[in-house]
Amino acid sequence: VQDTNNQRNYMFERLDLGVGETVYGLGERFTALVRNGQTVETWNRDGGTSTEQAYKNIPFYMTNRGYGVLVNHPQCVSFEVGSEKVSKVQFSVESEYLEYFVIDGPTPKAVLDRYTRFTGRPALPPAWSFGLWLTTSFTTNYDEATVNSFIDGMAERNLPLHVFHFDCFWMKAFQWCDFEWDPLTFPDPEGMIRRLKAKGLKICVWINPYIGQKSPVFKELQEKGYLLKRPDGSLWQWDKWQPGL
């Protein structure tokens, strides 16, 4: 199909949904577990849990009829799961080709087994990583006392805890991500981590592959050519999360 307005080419497929057939999958979503009635775009975006956007989109779904479908496409795939027509799953891509695989079961476990054998299986993470994690999340003003209050709150509620995660403000604001603890709020990070580990916790910190212009190391990275550049040789920057990212 060609969009006559912009001359872009699209390919799509429609597969039948039986009466009572329910669809699951398509990666991380913050909507209903059953995907029927939803329109899903498998394009990674940082939208938060109150939106239909997600970090971990996967163009694979399975149904309670004992099969799965994997759309093998590296770009955005749009799924209409019984939303345009209740008896159809439609998926489309902006391309001149469309490749997909139907994976038989007959059970959900068998579908997932064949799917992961086909796509490849990652190494098994350590056992502790499957435990309960607690994060500072969007807390923007916190220190060791705040962290301990969160951890103590879990203990008071008799909730197990295995990993504590420091969100972005363990570093100085708008200097993300230079791997430097904010000395005002965390003057003794090594000691703090030892104290947290003494409680039997694993520690995780928030990082991302970018650096803010406000960080003291930005100039050094720029001079040494470590930063991403545009085709014309200029530095690639934007202001989405912080100035001069």
Identify what each model region corresponds to.
Residues 1-127, 135-138, 144-145, 149-156:
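Catalytic and substrate-binding clefts that recognize carbohydrates or anionic sugar/phosphate headgroups
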Residues 123-245:
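Aromatic-lined carbohydrate-binding/catalytic grooves of carbohydrate-active enzymes
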